[in-house]
């Protein structure tokens, strides 16, 4: 198993697919990385040489923000919104949907399990 950006990527998959196991790399960035390094699209991870793995690792470290750094940046952005006290920050603080979805019904994923109300029966 090749270890790139602190993630063990599966060896039997194509490189483009395997790179998507890294947080912050999707289809587009995986294809970009493979094109930059010059690896054929059908090549599998177990067929990569150590030099190619090193090239991939260096490309990701140099050009992309992945894993812990990306998670940290996202959480800092949310924290900044909450500290500002803007509408989006208040919605995050109250664990409600941020992007304008309705909350009278639905929004259970964001709000958590429904709280039962005593005496409310039909």
UniProtKB/Swiss-Prot annotation:
Entry annotated with the keyword RNA-binding: yes
Region annotation (Disordered) ranges: 95-122
UniProt keywords, alphabetically: Ribonucleoprotein, Ribosomal protein, RNA-binding, rRNA-binding, tRNA-binding
UniProt keyword annotation of Electron transport present: no
Gene Ontology biological process terms, A to Z: translation
Pfam families: Ribosomal_S13
Entry's Gene Ontology molecular function annotations: rRNA binding; structural constituent of ribosome; tRNA binding
Domain of life, source organism: Bacteria
Cellular component GO terms, alphabetical: cytosol; small ribosomal subunit
Family designation: Belongs to the universal ribosomal protein uS13 family.
HAMAP family: Ribosomal_uS13
NCBIfam families the UniProt entry points to: uS13_bact (TIGR03631)
Subunit structure as annotated in this protein's UniProt entry: Part of the 30S ribosomal subunit. Forms a loose heterodimer with protein S19. Forms two bridges to the 50S subunit in the 70S ribosome.
Reported function: Located at the top of the head of the 30S subunit, it contacts several helices of the 16S rRNA. In the 70S ribosome it contacts the 23S rRNA (bridge B1a) and protein L5 of the 50S subunit (bridge B1b), connecting the 2 subunits; these bridges are implicated in subunit movement. Contacts the tRNAs in the A and P-sites.
Full protein name: Small ribosomal subunit protein uS13
Gene: rpsM
